[in-house]
């Protein structure tokens, strides 16, 4: 079984597709929710995700020297990828710390760093765009944004409009097809 198919099966079998009424981070309302956070506590799933991102980045000849993820959902993914690639980790906070060092980025970000940014789920891409812009403001070059699941609700277009390259591992349409769910059911 291909790793991507294995990931899709894990997402389905771990019950990550939930139905009901949900308000997403983007503020949009939805009748389904992709709960990747329950998946990214699974070491097997994290290994698969990290290997898929690493392989795809290699296929694309992406040159990067650091891995970043916005808190909270992307941190385990970024950590797994950091371990898989042996590249340093950066964590982009949702907001600047009010205490201690007051950092918005944890880790050593420097001007000219080539950063691979990861995210768990994208809808409009707002959260990951914000993280990418913060990295850019600190002198980093975001060479690619990888997401585990893209809901196909504008993230690709919004991210690319901001000048970033976007690489989803799985599209929600692929998940629904594999789970035997029609878009109308969702």
From Swiss-Prot:
Cite the binding residues for orotate. Answer: 123, 151
Q: Which InterPro entries match?
A: OPRT (IPR023031), Or_phspho_trans_dom (IPR004467), PRibTrfase_dom (IPR000836), PRTase-like (IPR029057)
Name of protein: Orotate phosphoribosyltransferase
Gene encoding the protein: pyrE
Give this protein's Gene Ontology molecular function annotations: magnesium ion binding; orotate phosphoribosyltransferase activity
PANTHER family documented for this protein? OROTATE PHOSPHORIBOSYLTRANSFERASE, URIDINE 5'-MONOPHOSPHATE SYNTHASE
Catalytic activities: orotidine 5'-phosphate + diphosphate = orotate + 5-phospho-alpha-D-ribose 1-diphosphate
Q: Where does 5-phospho-alpha-D-ribose 1-diphosphate bind?
A: 93-94, 97, 99, 119-127
Highest taxon, organism lineage: Archaea
What is stated as this protein's family in its record?
Belongs to the purine/pyrimidine phosphoribosyltransferase family. PyrE subfamily.
Q: Does the keyword Transferase apply?
A: yes
GO BP terms: 'de novo' UMP biosynthetic process; pyrimidine nucleobase biosynthetic process
- Please describe the quaternary structure of this protein: Homodimer.
Q: What does this protein do?
A: Catalyzes the transfer of a ribosyl phosphate group from 5-phosphoribose 1-diphosphate to orotate, leading to the formation of orotidine monophosphate (OMP).
Residue span of the signal peptide, if any? none
Keywords, in A-Z order: Glycosyltransferase, Magnesium, Pyrimidine biosynthesis, Transferase
**What's the cofactor?**
Mg(2+)
Q: Which Gene3D superfamilies does the record associate with it? A: 3.40.50.2020
Which pathway does it serve?
Pyrimidine metabolism; UMP biosynthesis via de novo pathway; UMP from orotate: step 1/2
The EC number(s) attached to this protein equal: 2.4.2.10
